[in-house]
């Protein structure tokens, strides 16, 4: 894939319409986690420094094409301005005369945040007329919201057809990192896929076993594979109806030469709660009332050794119920090991997905990974090998 890059664009005095992801967690009407605001800063600063008028487009929540006052983006302007160290004008609509007046009145290098694009039904329908109304406030289009790139909406896809289109700084970093992890990786490549259910990650598993040298499966989804192999998983989370599917994935991996790493021992308890009594069991020792809540120490040791033999790691999903210690041990040990390998340049380590980001933050190692994607659904679809409309629309 080839893209125009912002450093080649003539930006002075131009209105740059920038699609960002400000769909942030909220607590008591305030931004509870400003990660996504911070992710937009490099692009905003780059454009402002080049003398562009920076016009931010974003969605928040699911107003379903109607104005829902409690889903207004107004609350984002103040924390964004504080992070930016510059004023941010908020506009109560994203199209029409009110938006045009503020945008056209911006000084070069000034920043405006327009109202929630999803207040208009045309956004999610990718309506051509709505895209034109958005485009009326811009001379160039910049997409810095990789996390919304799996949606063919007016502000993520339609706009890119109407104005010269560029990836933003964060978007470009994301595309380069994902290409290094899956598109054109240094081999051998190991994947870690965790989380609770196989059913939500079928496309992902089928795509990865065809591309990776090794794939470690953890979390609740590993129980489905263990059950498919004939092991008793006690009262653990397990999609028993997907046993045949799990066996098909195992066969596919074998045919493709992808080594599957499943737990060989597990950490169990009678309930999920902090400080409960736990035990490490081999697979043959799991009891009827056991809940498997983490991979065991031998499984973790094998995973670390497999990482040592790899040059690229791609990670989506935790290995256990990391939110409730001590069921975080396998996830934390794997995360710390991957981070130390990445920091010393021995491996390219790319991770993504909401639970994964939370797990790496919990382990305190996010900063040492080569790249951590906060994109969620878009990251998952990229890993599944799907075309992302918002990315495809930027191709030059």
Curated annotation (Swiss-Prot):
<dbReference type="GO" id="GO:0005524">
    <property type="term" value="F:ATP binding"/>
</dbReference>
<keyword id="KW-0324">Glycolysis</keyword>
<dbReference type="InterPro" id="IPR036043">
    <property type="entry name" value="Phosphoglycerate_kinase_sf"/>
</dbReference>
<feature type="binding site">
    <location>
        <position position="36"/>
    </location>
    <ligand>
        <name>substrate</name>
    </ligand>
</feature>
<keyword id="KW-0067">ATP-binding</keyword>
<keyword id="KW-0418">Kinase</keyword>
<dbReference type="GO" id="GO:0043531">
    <property type="term" value="F:ADP binding"/>
</dbReference>
<dbReference type="GO" id="GO:0006094">
    <property type="term" value="P:gluconeogenesis"/>
</dbReference>
<keyword id="KW-0808">Transferase</keyword>
<feature type="binding site">
    <location>
        <begin position="59"/>
        <end position="62"/>
    </location>
    <ligand>
        <name>substrate</name>
    </ligand>
</feature>
<feature type="binding site">
    <location>
        <position position="323"/>
    </location>
    <ligand>
        <name>ATP</name>
    </ligand>
</feature>
<dbReference type="InterPro" id="IPR001576">
    <property type="entry name" value="Phosphoglycerate_kinase"/>
</dbReference>
<keyword id="KW-0547">Nucleotide-binding</keyword>
<feature type="binding site">
    <location>
        <position position="118"/>
    </location>
    <ligand>
        <name>substrate</name>
    </ligand>
</feature>
<comment type="subunit">
    <text>Monomer.</text>
</comment>
<comment type="similarity">
    <text>Belongs to the phosphoglycerate kinase family.</text>
</comment>
<dbReference type="InterPro" id="IPR015824">
    <property type="entry name" value="Phosphoglycerate_kinase_N"/>
</dbReference>
<dbReference type="GO" id="GO:0005829">
    <property type="term" value="C:cytosol"/>
</dbReference>
<comment type="pathway">
    <text>Carbohydrate degradation; glycolysis; pyruvate from D-glyceraldehyde 3-phosphate: step 2/5.</text>
</comment>
<feature type="binding site">
    <location>
        <position position="151"/>
    </location>
    <ligand>
        <name>substrate</name>
    </ligand>
</feature>
<dbReference type="Pfam" id="PF00162">
    <property type="entry name" value="PGK"/>
</dbReference>
<dbReference type="GO" id="GO:0004618">
    <property type="term" value="F:phosphoglycerate kinase activity"/>
</dbReference>
<feature type="binding site">
    <location>
        <begin position="21"/>
        <end position="23"/>
    </location>
    <ligand>
        <name>substrate</name>
    </ligand>
</feature>
<protein>
    <recommendedName>
        <fullName>Phosphoglycerate kinase</fullName>
        <ecNumber>2.7.2.3</ecNumber>
    </recommendedName>
</protein>
<feature type="binding site">
    <location>
        <position position="201"/>
    </location>
    <ligand>
        <name>ATP</name>
    </ligand>
</feature>
<keyword id="KW-0963">Cytoplasm</keyword>
<dbReference type="GO" id="GO:0006096">
    <property type="term" value="P:glycolytic process"/>
</dbReference>
<feature type="binding site">
    <location>
        <begin position="353"/>
        <end position="356"/>
    </location>
    <ligand>
        <name>ATP</name>
    </ligand>
</feature>
């Amino acid at each position: 894939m080839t893209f125009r890059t912002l450093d080649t664009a003539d930006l002075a005095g131009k209105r740059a319409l920038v699609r960002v992801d400000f769909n942030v967690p909220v607590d008591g009407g305030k931004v509870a986690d400003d990660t996504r605001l911070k992710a937009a800063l490099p692009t905003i600063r780059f454009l402002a420094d080049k003398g562009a008028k920076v016009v931010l487009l974003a969605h928040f929540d699911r107003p379903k094409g109607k104005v829902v006052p409690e889903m207004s983006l107004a609350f984002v302007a103040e924390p964004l301005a504080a992070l930016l160290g510059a004023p941010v004008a908020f506009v109560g609509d994203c199209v029409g005369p009110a938006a045009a007046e503020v945008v056209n009145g911006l000084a070069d290098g000034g920043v405006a945040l327009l109202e929630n694009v999803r207040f208009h039904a045309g956004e999610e329908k990718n309506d051509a007329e709505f895209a034109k109304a958005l485009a009326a406030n811009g001379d160039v289009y910049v997409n810095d919201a990789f996390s919304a790139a799996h949606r063919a909406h007016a502000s993520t896809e339609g706009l890119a057809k109407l104005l010269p289109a560029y990836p933003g700084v964060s978007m470009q970093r994301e595309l380069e990192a994902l290409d290094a992890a899956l598109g054109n990786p240094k081999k051998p490549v190991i994947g870690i896929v965790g989380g609770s259910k196989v059913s939500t990650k079928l496309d992902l598993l089928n795509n990865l076993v065809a591309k990776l040298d090794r794939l470690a499966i953890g979390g609740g989804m590993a129980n489905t594979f263990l059950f498919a192999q004939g092991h008793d998983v006690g009262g653990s989370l397990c999609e028993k109806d997907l046993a045949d599917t799990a066996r098909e994935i195992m066969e596919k991996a074998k045919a493709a030469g992808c080594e599957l790493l499943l737990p060989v021992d597990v950490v169990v308890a009678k309930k999920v709660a902090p400080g409960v009594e736990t035990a490490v069991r081999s697979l043959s020792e799991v009891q009827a009332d056991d809940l498997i809540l983490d991979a065991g120490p031998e499984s973790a040791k094998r995973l670390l050794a497999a990482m040592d033999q790899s040059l690229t790691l791609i990670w989506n999903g935790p290995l256990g119920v990391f939110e409730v210690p001590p069921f975080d041990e396998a996830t934390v040990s794997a995360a710390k090991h991957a981070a130390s390998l990445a920091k010393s340049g021995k491996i390219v380590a790319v991770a993504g997905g909401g639970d994964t980001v939370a797990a790496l933050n919990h382990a305190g190692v996010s900063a040492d990974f080569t790249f951590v994607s906060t994109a969620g659904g878009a990251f998952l679809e990229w890993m599944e090998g799907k075309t992302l409309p918002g990315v495809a629309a930027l191709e030059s």
